[in-house]
Amino acid sequence: MGKEDKTHINVVVIGHVDSGKSTTTGHLIYQCGGIDKRTIEKFEKEAAELGKGSFKYAWVLDKLKAERERGITIDIALWKFETPKYYVTVIDAPGHRDFIKNMITGTSQADCAILIIAAGTGEFEAGISKDGQTREHALLAYTLGVKQLIVAINKMDTANWAEARYQEIIKETSNFIKKVGFNPKAVAFVPISGFNGDNMLTPSTNCPWYKGWEKETKAGKFTGKTLLEAIDSIEPPKRPTDKPLRLPLQDVYKIGGIGTVPVGRIETGVLKPGMVVTFAPSNVTTEVKSVEMHHEQLAEGQPGDNVGFNVKNVSVKEIRRGNVAGDSKNDPPMGAASFTAQVIVMNHPGQVGAGYAPVLDCHTAHIACKFAELLEKIDRRTGKATESAPKFIKSGDSAIVKMIPSKPMCVEAFTDYPPLGRFAVRDMRQTVAVGVIKAVEKSSAAAAKVTKSAAKAAKK
């Protein structure tokens, strides 16, 4: 397999704060990843000097995190590792205070979640207790459409690799993930030590009783022994090239001698020079002159690509971050007058009722929206209504809500365009709720601007 032929997949690592997420992720990146040996040796030396030798993998990760949080643009390759089949990017490990927001507006949808559970006495119980963040993160992943899961039972060395303990944990965890919505039969359970490396890349000699993991999905039956093999058995994502174009703008630049250059990540569809695109909710239509990525011209940009594209006769004042570009001839994007969404309240101290108007983060847009009407309260797991027209909802509740944006914004139903159909509700400087959009009432188009070049291109 040539270097270029491997599929890229994204994983998100979830679990309780002390489950060993950093150590486990650090180990994978360390052994199969983009951290060059020099950096590692530097980190190891620092760790040893500070008496943190026992944390070496986590230390590597902490260094990367610290640099990333200080805004030093850290080489993102450091968060990647390679398996025989895939290039894997670790999207964001929780614990990061913006984890939830990142997971929703995040640069990408995770293809699989890796749930890390600590086997130590008391640790496991704390991790999946009722108020545990583990439950919250797992539910969040599931609600946001992450349908594949791997469970790694970590710190097996602290449980002396006892088979009985492992079986007990598997039984409990199976019930736990079933309640969240995952099917345990389709999940690989792997006993590991993220620190010592058991069953990470090579089978451990410490658990002769362990015959390997197995999972059964629509695609068939898979078996293996290590965490790496479990990651390799993730089903590859179908990238949405066949859908109409949706490209939320991250920035719009004015470049001397070239003109206006919007920049963003293609979420669905393709973008090619010569295409006529419409920006919503600005309602501007124009022709794309050129498309480039990493300073190279592209014949075609695809989902996942972060591109800049040059548009003709459009000023920087007319389009902005949060606008969405789409193909003017194929389901062009439009502003939303209102939308209904399933909203899950996560950590709001009080009650939320009609009239609440927090800020929504949806793709690159950041706009206040009013909870106009609480239509029904629903059971998070089954999606069935439990109460119609509730007066209030509080933490832990889920409801179908009609929402009205305070100013024009472009969103879509989650089933049509997932990245444009999930949002975080921010208030008091934290994520207080998350939502998945069910339906959108598009606004009747205001006066539209169509540039001359677009009109000319349309006649061709």
Curated annotation (Swiss-Prot):
Pfam families: GTP-eEF1A_C, GTP_EFTU, GTP_EFTU_D2. Residues 15-22 are annotated as: G1. It comes from the Eukaryota. Residues 193-195 are annotated as: G5. HAMAP family: EF_Tu_A. This is Elongation factor 1-alpha. InterPro entries: EFTu-like_2, G_TR_CS, GTP-eEF1A_C, P-loop_NTPase, T_Tr_GTP-bd_dom, TRAFAC_GTPase_members, Transl_B-barrel_sf, Transl_elong_EF1A/Init_IF2_C. Keywords: Cytoplasm, Elongation factor, GTP-binding, Methylation, Nucleotide-binding, Protein biosynthesis. This protein promotes the GTP-dependent binding of aminoacyl-tRNA to the A-site of ribosomes during protein biosynthesis. The keyword Oxidoreductase does not apply. The modification N6,N6,N6-trimethyllysine is found at residue 80. PANTHER family: TRANSLATION FACTOR (PTHR23115). Its main location: cytoplasm. It is found in: Cytoplasm.
